[in-house]
C-alpha cells in the first residue's frame, strides 16, 4: 500500500505463507513504482520480512518494522484488511482458492483502487488522488 494515496500497488493471494510469495509481490511493487526518491517499506516482524532473502531484495529501501505486538504501527494495511472483509468478502461463502482470488481481484482492481473514496485522499479514490498529484506536479 502506498501510504500517500492508499493505493494497493501489488498483492498476492497464497495458499501458503511462503517467503517466495512475499518476494514476488515486492518485485511487482518495485517494478510498478520506479522512483528516485527513497522508498520506506513498513512491515511487521514476521519471518518473511526478516528473512535474508527479503533483506537482500530491500537493501535499497528503508525497512521500517512495527514494534512487537503493536499492530497500530501497520494501521493502514490492518484497516484495509478489515475493509475488504467487511465490505466484500463476508458477503460470500468462499468455496475454493479460485473464487477467493476472483473476489479479492474484483474488490481491489474494480473497486478499492478505482472507486472507493478515502478521507485521507480528499474523498477521492486512490487512483484519482494519484492522478491529481501527478497533474499538480507537472504544472
Model-derived features: where do they sit?
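Hydrophobic "anchor" residues on beta-strands that sit immediately upstream
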Residues: 40
